[in-house]
């Protein structure tokens, strides 16, 4: 009995060792780091930071085209946080929800628009950061830490009383739920991004470049939906943790 439980636990822990494609490894001391994640992640961050600087450099009371676009994005992200977390608590969490959404969107679009697998390197291959299970698991664990912090900061130790509500019989199920949340977030994002990259790469290799365009457009749409789902669920989990348990 206990042997099976340990095997199940080990399968969850070993999820970070899942490898798809040929990774570009950097060796630092005794550790091996996925270099393609660092390279493409920094490219995505540079693009996002550059857009943010360009969009906020010359702010005016009468917004121009680019400023209008940036304000639209900000209002969209504010609405996600406000609708899921609540009007009184959402402002503190806007930076986190916005960062999660924009990073995932940028990473997904990088994978959908750029055929990284066609770029030859002496060793390994480039890919979108969200094409690596380690990245998606890390993002999901950040969300787990965020909603634990939200619950403890709002309700103190009383936050853990939710595990025995509405009855102590549900304690194991409520504890298991906290493990399934990051797993579902990470695998959903990883699976969708990986599938999209593989489809685009195969079509690009088999047929002329114009044929895969509809697939790439569909990939952009699906990538945007995945970023929206991840950030919305993250905000929903935080909002759930901030609720007063046991209150009418």
From Swiss-Prot:
Query: Is Coiled coil among the key words of this record?
Result: no
Q: Which CDD domains match?
A: ATP-synt_Fo_a_6
Question: One of this protein's Pfam families, by short name?
Answer: ATP-synt_A
The Gene Ontology CC terms held by the record are: chloroplast thylakoid membrane; plasma membrane; proton-transporting ATP synthase complex
For whether the record's keyword set contains Lipid metabolism, the answer is no
Q: Which UniProt keywords apply?
A: ATP synthesis, CF(0), Chloroplast, Hydrogen ion transport, Ion transport, Membrane, Plastid, Thylakoid, Transmembrane, Transmembrane helix, Transport
Database matches in InterPro entries? ATP_syn_F0_a_bact/chloroplast, ATP_synth_F0_asu, ATP_synth_F0_asu_AS, F0_ATP_A_sf
The entry assigns this protein to a family as follows: Belongs to the ATPase A chain family.
Q: How does it assemble?
A: F-type ATPases have 2 components, CF(1) - the catalytic core - and CF(0) - the membrane proton channel. CF(1) has five subunits: alpha(3), beta(3), gamma(1), delta(1), epsilon(1). CF(0) has four main subunits: a, b, b' and c.
The record's function comment reads: Key component of the proton channel; it plays a direct role in the translocation of protons across the membrane.
Give the protein name, as stated in the record: ATP synthase subunit a, chloroplastic
Source organism of this protein record:
Antithamnion sp.
């Amino acid at each position: 009995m206990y042997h099976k439980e340990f095997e199940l636990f080990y399968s969850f822990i070993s999820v970070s060792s899942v490898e798809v494609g040929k990774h570009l490894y950097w060796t630092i001391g005794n550790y091996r780091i996925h270099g393609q994640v660092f390279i493409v992640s920094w490219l995505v961050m540079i693009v996002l930071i550059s857009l943010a600087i360009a969009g906020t450099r010359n702010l005016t009371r009468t917004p121009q085209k680019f400023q209008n676009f940036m304000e639209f994005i900000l209002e969209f992200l504010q609405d996600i946080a406000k609708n899921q977390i609540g009007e009184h608590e959402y402002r503190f969490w806007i930076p986190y929800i916005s960062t999660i959404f924009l990073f995932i969107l940028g990473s997904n679009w990088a994978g959908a628009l750029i055929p990284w697998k066609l770029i030859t390197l002496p060793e390994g291959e480039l890919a979108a950061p969200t094409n690596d299970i380690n990245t998606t698991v890390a993002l999901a664990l950040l969300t787990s830490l965020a909603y634990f912090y939200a619950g403890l900061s709002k309700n103190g130790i009383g936050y853990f009383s939710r595990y025995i509500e509405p009855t102590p019989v549900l304690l194991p199920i409520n504890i298991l739920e906290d493990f399934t949340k990051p797993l579902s977030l990470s695998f959903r994002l990883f699976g969708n991004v990986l599938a999209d990259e593989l489809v685009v790469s195969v079509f690009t290799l088999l047929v002329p470049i114009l044929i895969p365009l509809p697939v790439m457009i569909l990939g952009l749409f699906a990538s945007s939906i995945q970023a929206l789902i991840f950030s919305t669920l993250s905000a929903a989990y935080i909002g759930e943790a901030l609720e007063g348990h046991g209150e009418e």
